[in-house]
Amino acid sequence: MKQEDTNRSTMNIQWYPGHMTKTRRMIEEDVKLVDAVCEILDARIPIASRNPDIDAICGNKPRMIVLNRIDMADPALTKKWAEHFRTKGYAVLQTDCKTKKGISGFVPAVRTLLAEKLARYAEKGQVGRPLKLMVVGIPNVGKSTFINQIAGRKGAKAENRPGVTRGKQWITVDQGLLLLDTPGILWPKFEDPEVGMRLAYTGAVKEDVIDTETLACHFIALLAKYYPQTLSERYKLEAPEGADGYELLQLAGKKRGYLVSGGEVNTERMAKALMDDYRSGKLGKLTLESPEDTQ
């Protein structure tokens, strides 16, 4: 799903606060303490929500991918993504933390992933020695909520604002499994500007790094290409052939009656409404990337 350019310029999205460098160093040290690494991804943007630095940081540690927020993602594409990651050698779990769907499969999946280590513990008479798993993910992929559900607690502060979970903490899941939570970490530069855009669509980067209208223009053009039925159902909009993102935003605003004096469309209001609708799930189950994009 390669997004076509609109006639509105793409802004260069960068967000790498100073604490990110410190966080990376901390993770590089702490990964030595664990048996495996669990990476939480947003099922709507599995490429964009993967930190490309994590592979280098984790080395040869066994890995698990959690495709989170499957309630907001296209089920057919989620299935494709799960198969894609399995063929790459990852254990894969699909979750919706709001309804706890998939959560019960986590501990069994970890034990399967680390079955050889458990067998070695048994051979050494270390039955009961806990497995240690590091949980990583970029800001706002639902990592804290995931950990809360796994551990059955409300201890890891979850907030819909990028970068809110700080510090290091071990969480006891049961007597045989400890989780090491880590702060959300981005990477210094988005090599592909589309990655930055997709992170901005879902709210994984702060809103002040890109103009909302510019973001909405690119997003509505993407909807017109891959999910035209969503535009029709939600905004009563049939996208004219060849219309760019700004024109589509104006048409949607007109349909909504978002007008200012003189009959001009309030595109700023429409842009905010569009992005709010997407982030709250009102546009339905939409996935913005497919495994074919990795080829």
Feature map (PLM): residue ranges:
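Anionic group-transfer/hydrolysis microenvironments
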Residues: L41-R44, I70, I150, P183
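Glycine-rich phosphate-binding P-loop
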Residues: K132-G152, A156, T182
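Alpha-helical scaffold segments in soluble metabolic enzymes
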Residues: G105, A109, T145, H218, ...
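Short, glycine/charged-enriched secondary-structure capping and boundary segments
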Residues: P52-D55, K79-A82, V107-A109, N148-A151, ...
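Canonical P-loop GTPase G-domain recognition
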Residues: M64, I70-V136, G155, G257-L259, ...
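Conserved active-site beta-strand-loop modules that form the wall/rim of enzyme catalytic pockets
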Residues: C97, I147, L177-L180
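Short, structured loop/turn "capping" segments at alpha-beta junctions
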Residues: K117-Y121, N148, K154-N160, Y226-L231
